[in-house]
Swiss-Prot record:
Protein name: Transcription elongation factor GreA
Record function comment: Necessary for efficient RNA polymerase transcription elongation past template-encoded arresting sites. The arresting sites in DNA have the property of trapping a certain fraction of elongating RNA polymerases that pass through, resulting in locked ternary complexes. Cleavage of the nascent transcript by cleavage factors such as GreA or GreB allows the resumption of elongation from the new 3'terminus. GreA releases sequences of 2 to 3 nucleotides.
Key words of the record: DNA-binding, Transcription, Transcription regulation
Cited PROSITE patterns: GREAB_1, GREAB_2
Organism ancestry: Bacteria, Pseudomonadati, Pseudomonadota, Alphaproteobacteria, Hyphomicrobiales
Gene3D superfamilies membership: Transcription elongation factor, GreA/GreB, C-terminal domain (3.10.50.30), Transcription elongation factor, GreA/GreB, N-terminal domain (1.10.287.180)
């Protein structure tokens, strides 16, 4: 059975855009660079040729990865999500029980995670600790700097 990859609609669109760019813009650019480098003669010592071939390999690998991800994507409509329990797509406001610093995270798919933007992967330790909890609950997360305790202040959707 094919393992589905949970994703927000925005994350799915970003993957599709990257796939389109790599196929329709980057691939032809690299092919042109290879042809240009090949025209310079001896390929054994042609750094431009080898760099272009390496870029082609990287691009084709990423295209394969993106095709696989978009095929397995399970796009979850966050506008239809509700409830008090935390699950995929939830925006969660937490307070650090030691420092009283507030943080807000949205739980997203692995491919969409960006901690600086407040999006954490569903497979991250903090997201795993949050799943199934609700406002008022406390969680403990083992972080690289030691254990952290948070209280859940708010859960929202969309």
């Amino acid at each position: 059975m094919v393992e589905k990859v949970p994703m927000t609609p925005g994350g799915f669109v970003k993957l599709q855009e990257e796939l389109r760019w790599r196929q329709q813009e980057e691939r032809p650019r690299i092919i042109e660079a290879i042809a240009e480098a090949r025209a310079h003669g001896d390929l054994s010592e042609n750094a431009e040729y080898h760099a272009a071939k390496e870029a082609q390999s990287h691009n084709e690998g990423r295209i394969s990865e993106l095709e696989d991800l978009t095929a397995r994507a399970e796009v979850i409509d966050l506008t239809k999500m509700s409830g008090d329990k935390i699950k995929f797509g939830a925006k969660v406001k937490l307070i650090d029980e030691d420092t009283e610093e507030e943080k807000t995270y949205q739980i997203v798919g692995d491919q969409e995670a960006d901690v600086k933007a407040g999006r954490i992967s569903i497979s991250s330790p903090i997201a795993r600790a949050l799943i199934g909890k609700e406002v008022g609950d406390s969680i403990e997360v083992n972080a690289p700097g030691g254990s952290k305790a948070y209280e859940i202040l708010q859960v929202s959707w969309g």
